[in-house]
Swiss-Prot record:
Domain of life the protein comes from: Bacteria
Alphabetized NCBIfam families for the sequence: parC_Gneg (TIGR01062), PRK05561.1 (NF004044)
Cellular component GO terms held in the UniProt record: chromosome; cytoplasm; DNA topoisomerase type II (double strand cut, ATP-hydrolyzing) complex; extrinsic component of plasma membrane
Interaction with DNA (site feature) positions: 49, 85, 87
Enzymatic reactions: ATP-dependent breakage, passage and rejoining of double-stranded DNA
Function noted in UniProt: Topoisomerase IV is essential for chromosome segregation. It relaxes supercoiled DNA. Performs the decatenation events required during the replication of a circular DNA molecule.
Protein name listed in UniProt: DNA topoisomerase 4 subunit A
Protein family according to the UniProt entry: Belongs to the type II topoisomerase GyrA/ParC subunit family. ParC type 1 subfamily.
Catalytic residues in the record: 129 (o-(5'-phospho-dna)-tyrosine intermediate)
Site (Transition state stabilizer): 128
Keyword Membrane included in the entry's annotation: yes
Protein's membrane topology: Peripheral membrane protein
């Protein structure tokens, strides 16, 4: 702790200079240590923070055992803050309430009577209205505390004594978990199943060198038992992989994905509704429903029609789908993605090792320290019992002497002024023996029987020999600890109502990401409009006539096409880059839209080449002005960031010029020199990124247009007058050749623009 500096006497004439940096460091260190050691972090041995330990100890002092009657929480809080914990009454009451909540504690330590809050987040009633007593769990934590099982220390005012740690016969740290934020560190431990913890502890006693994997449940060997994973008081489905959980337990850091438990209820005639019966740990039901309702109003859940809370004592949240055709799995996956119906519970096993050193511990280390503590408690209780037996044997020895000399003893007591000293001298008694004889009632003295004394003496002597043998043998001590753990395991077995596992395990379904994303977007028709200068907007509905569209001065239409708000829009630039925008993310049709460069990181020297709706099954041919090109799968050019994805490598003055869908088995290429070359598409390589290969050779100029077609159907083009021309396979013989050829002059009737469409 920091140095206590009292203000010096003498006023301004007696000022002591203090280095500010050193003084701040000293006081902050004192504060940090106080927070870590006496407030925020639990002890690995009993799993309790000081405030919880003091509450349980105070209730024990008040006699609030599981079989006793309840007492007002106001009385408990008063004793705690008055004798042990000099802090605010509300903070102590909040801690007491949490110990009693069956949705906060996997194994409640306090049995509460009255309103102790609920899973909706409502507060408990004031402590003048509620009552409490300890549960069996608290009794186990205290077991042996009156038998010198643990050390005691003075309280804050040195008027009472409090335990530094509880005996902890129950594996409370892992069974009930813990959370807290200290200075520069924090702890977060989820609750576990006591039956499984006892299995792991028993295995660790037999195999002290067991690894974390040895303590975990193995589906291939279910008979061995072990820890499956967290077991939350609110249930839920854990969808974390076993490998990930093992790594978390090995390092002491990680997390667990937990989902709500849900089922589909058939309403007949094809109708159904989804019912959520369990929600993730530490999620407030009222806030969860409020969040889903907000998303519903914001039209972020187009598959959901309504949500109702039909909960009574049990959780029952009803989700009404938009229609009978809605896929329940996709609806739930979208809710898991957007709401706390799926939560990640962190694991950070940062605890006070042996009550002194804060450190992050692995699962086997936590259990090992708890077992070491239980062994120490066993030794201390055994020594305490041994001392009590020795005292009793000494007294019984005195009783036996008194019995054999009963008449003389009575005479000494009646006639001597100092009977104690006389008996010690006459019979060779110890001070304790003489005092015990003198303290006996006359009735008891007359009823002394040698047989009863010798029977008790022999019984205690036998017990003493057993305890001495126990203290002399490490193996016997571990056997005794294992027996105690076995009794706890029976009491909280999975066959019992409290002990049965509540959280189950499942693999997260391989959901269609595209389907989930679309499920979160209201599907509406739009028309995407991009101008020559790169302004983009989305008009509501499908608009065929774009002649009435308004643009800024000097700007005009570059490309427009129909789409849906659920579509992905691919934008290809002259720099060979592809960008992806969601149809629902495009600016509205009012005004001129927004510049593309605000939405994506598009270089200033690049322009929009084309844009279209993404089709993951489609392939494209991309070509540069110089006549290089290749085939790319459309799904390979989807970009997930603002930076886009470089598809075609071009160097100025060369730039990307054409992006054409693959629709056949041959490719027709027309150059600016009005020469056409036709060759099989298989000669063009397929790649995700590159410069490509030469499609057509030119002396001057570059490529003008490309068309992919099926040779069996022939090559078709349209002139400026709208007339359609088709050349069959036989008619194309003179233009057919191999890739990178020069080609021949285009056929008669080919458009003067050098394009396949007028």
């Amino acid at each position: 702790m920091g140095q206590s500096l009292l203000p010096p006497s003498g006023g301004d004439d007696n000022i002591q200079p203090v280095d500010l940096k050193a003084a701040l460091e000293e006081r902050y260190l004192a504060y940090a240590l106080s927070t870590i050691m006496h407030r925020a972090l639990p002890d690995v041995r009993d799993g309790l923070k000081p405030v919880h330990r003091r509450i349980i100890h105070a209730m024990s002092e008040m006699g609030l055992r599981p079989n006793s009657s309840f007492k007002k929480c106001a009385r408990i809080v008063g004793d705690v803050i008055g004798k042990f914990h000099p802090h605010g009454d509300q903070s102590v009451y909040d801690a007491l309430v949490r110990l009693a909540q069956d949705f906060s504690q996997r194994y409640p330590v306090v049995d509460g009577q009255g309103n102790f809050g609920n899973i909706d987040g409502d507060n408990a009633a004031a402590y003048r209205y509620t009552e409490a007593k300890m549960t069996e769990v608290a009794a186990l934590l205290l077991e042996g505390i009156d038998q010198d099982a643990v050390d005691f220390r003075p309280t804050y005012n040195e008027e009472d004594q409090e335990p530094t740690v509880l005996p902890g016969a129950f594996p409370n740290l892992l069974a009930n978990g813990a959370s807290g934020i200290a200075v520069g560190m924090a702890t977060s431990i989820p609750p576990h199943n006591a039956h499984e913890l006892c299995d792991a502890a028993l295995h660790l006693i037999k195999h002290p060198d067991a690894t974390v994997e040895d303590l975990l449940f193995d589906p291939a060997n279910p008979q061995r038992g072990g820890i499956e994973g967290p077991d939350f008081p609110t249930g839920g489905v854990i969808v974390e992989s076993r490998a990930s959980m093992a790594e978390s337990y090995r390092t002491g850091r990680g997390g667990f994905r937990v989902r709500a438990r849900w089922a589909v209820e058939d309403l007949g005639r094809g109708g159904f509704q989804i019912v959520v019966t369990e929600i993730p740990y530490q999620v407030q039901k009222s806030r969860l429903i409020e969040k889903i309702a907000e998303l519903l109003i914001a039209r972020k859940l187009p598959l959901l029609e309504d949500i109702r809370d039909e909960s009574a004592e049990d959780v029952r949240v009803v989700l009404v789908p938009k229609s009978r055709s809605v896929d329940a799995n996709i609806l739930m996956e979208s809710l898991f993605k957007l709401t706390e119906l799926e939560s990640r519970i962190p694991l950070n096993m940062n605890v006070l090792s042996m009550g002194r050193v804060p450190r992050v511990m692995a699962l086997n280390e936590v259990l090992s320290e708890w077992l070491a503590h239980r062994r120490e408690v066993l030794q201390r209780r055994s020594r305490h019992r041994l001392a009590a037996i020795d005292r009793r044997l000494e007294i019984l020895g005195g009783y036996l002497i008194a019995y054999l000399n009963i008449d003389e003893v009575i005479r000494i007591i009646r006639e001597e002024d100092e009977p104690k000293a006389v008996m010690i001298e006459r019979f060779g008694l110890t001070d304790v023996q003489a005092e015990a004889i003198l303290n006996m009632r006359l009735r008891s003295l007359r009823k002394l029987e040698e047989f009863e004394i010798r029977t008790e003496f022999d019984s205690l002597s036998k017990e003493k020999a057993e305890i001495e043998a126990l203290l002399a043998s490490g193996d016997k001590q571990w056997q005794a600890v294992a027996w105690e753990i076995g009794e706890v395991k029976k009491k909280f077995a999975k066959a019992t109502e409290l002990g049965k596992r509540r959280s189950t395990f499942s693999d997260a379904p391989d959901a269609d990401v595209e389907a989930i994303q679309q499920a979160m977007i209201e599907k509406e028709p739009i028309t995407v409009v991009i101008s020559e200068k790169g302004w983009i907007r989305a008009l509501k509905g499908h608009i065929a006539d774009t002649s009435s569209l308004q643009f800024k001065d000097g700007d005009g239409l570059k490309v427009s096409f129909p789409a849906q708000t659920t579509d992905k829009i691919l934008i290809f630039t002259t720099g060979g880059k592809a960008y992806t925008l969601g149809g629902d993310k495009l600016p509205g049709g009012r005004g001129h839209g927004e510049p593309l460069r605000i939405m994506v990181d598009m270089e200033n020297d690049q322009d929009v080449l084309t844009a279209f709706v993404h089709d993951p099954a489609r392939k494209l041919i991309v070509s540069s002005t110089a006549g290089n090109g290749f085939v790319v799968t459309e799904s390979d050019i989807v970009a997930n960031t603002r930076k886009g994805k470089q598809v075609m490598n071009v160097t100025m003055p060369d730039e990307a010029k054409l992006v054409v869908p693959v629709k056949g088995d041959h490719l027709a290429v027309v150059g600016e020199n009005r020469k056409m070359l036709v060759f099989p598409l298989v000669q063009v390589p397929e790649m995700a990124r590159g410069k490509g290969v030469r499609l057509q050779r030119y002396k001057d100029g570059g490529v003008s247009d490309i068309r992919s077609f099926a040779i069996a159907e022939g090559l078709t083009w349209e002139d400026s007058a709208g007339r359609v021309f088709t050349k069959t396979r036989d008619e194309l013989i003179e233009w057919m050749g191999d890739r990178a050829g020069a080609g021949r002059v285009v056929p008669k009737g080919f458009p003067r623009s050098g394009k396949f469409s007028g």
